[in-house]
Structures are given as structure tokens and as C-alpha cells.
């Protein structure tokens, strides 16, 4: 989305009262991952863990994670807002409170959460508030949505490390929200693994040039 055409009100979060009402029935999505063939929906193997990340356009964000060894499956969707079972158009309206996010299901014995955090921080600019590059709106905000206290602690610690690195490079304060994961709503089938289906598709995702330690 061009900033020239973006409406400023899309950068303002709705309240639970003003958000769209949504629907009781989930929207239709894909059954399997287009790249790996793994089932998108749970239940997942018991040795897997999961986290949800928001870092701008979810097409490019998802590709960053499905390429990592140790990641079992990824899916794009909507979370951290109010509207149940939203559509893409509703999320883009700015009236759901949801973020465009990536669900990452991973094997912690093969890839660490610290590694996932490093990819997250390196792949976008977490200081831009309700936007990412030319994409303006609450659905493009930076966020880490955690499923355990351990994930929360690691995310907060990494945020401090990254803030120091960004400050040294002249960037402002990190605006990333780190909160307990809310319900994840799968996006439409069209959006799942979009850049694998459309290799020339556009997604304005860019980092700051930092390299985050993940040891």
C-alpha cells in the first residue's frame, strides 16, 4: 500500500466496541502447506512449540520462517485484535484491530526460539509503529505473540539487545508489542505461502541491516 493513498485513520486501533463484529464460522483456508505438504491446522506433534510474529506484509514474513531448518509448518493469519474470523478485506480496513501475522510451529531441538527471534528482528524495522515501509495500518505493526513465560522472557531480553543495536545505528525506540498470544485466525487459502505460488509477487519487507546474535 502506498502511503500517499493510505488513510491516516487506519493507523489508529479500534476498540472492542467499535471493531467489526465478524462471524462465528471460520473462513475457508488451505488444508496443507503449499511448500512442505504439512497440515496447516492443529493438532501438531507433541514435541513442537509455536509462536506468532507480526512484521509487516505477511507474504514475505512467512517465507522468512518456512525456509528455516527445524520449522515444522507456517501459516499466515490474523491475530491480536477483536473481530472473530475476519476476512482479509476487513483486516485491511483497520476496523478489526488484528495484525497480519505468521504462525510458526517449530521443533525446539532443531531450531531455537532465539534463532526465530533473530530472524524476526533482522527482517523488518521494528521502530515504525503502525506501519512497515510504505505499508500503513494497524495490521502492519511489529509484534511477538508468545505461548509461554520462557518465550516472553527471551523476547523481552532480545528486544533490549536489539534496541541497543538500533540506537547505535540512529534508529528510534522499538514499538514492537510482546504479549501473550491470542486466538489465531487462519487467512484465506490465497494468502497461504503466497510467494511460493507467486515468486514474482511484491512484498515490501525490509530490515535495518543489523545481525542479531542467537547463541
Swiss-Prot record:
GO MF assignments: L-methionine-(S)-S-oxide reductase activity; peptide-methionine (S)-S-oxide reductase activity
Top EC category: oxidoreductase
Catalytic reactions on record: L-methionyl-[protein] + [thioredoxin]-disulfide + H2O = L-methionyl-(S)-S-oxide-[protein] + [thioredoxin]-dithiol; [thioredoxin]-disulfide + L-methionine + H2O = L-methionine (S)-S-oxide + [thioredoxin]-dithiol
Enzyme Commission numbers on file: 1.8.4.11
GO cellular component, as recorded: cytoplasm
A Pfam family hit: PMSR
Keyword Nucleotidyltransferase applies: no
Active site location: 57
GO biological process: cellular response to oxidative stress; protein modification process
Keywords (A to Z) from UniProt: Oxidoreductase
UniProt keyword annotation of Oxidoreductase present: yes
Cross-referenced InterPro entries: Met_Sox_Rdtase_MsrA_dom (IPR002569), Met_Sox_Rdtase_MsrA_sf (IPR036509), MsrA_MetSO_reductase (IPR050162)
Annotated function: Has an important function as a repair enzyme for proteins that have been inactivated by oxidation. Catalyzes the reversible oxidation-reduction of methionine sulfoxide in proteins to methionine.
Family listed: Belongs to the MsrA Met sulfoxide reductase family.
Protein name: Peptide methionine sulfoxide reductase MsrA
Native source organism of the sequence: Saccharophagus degradans (strain 2-40 / ATCC 43961 / DSM 17024)
Top-level taxonomy: Bacteria, Pseudomonadati, Pseudomonadota, Gammaproteobacteria, Cellvibrionales
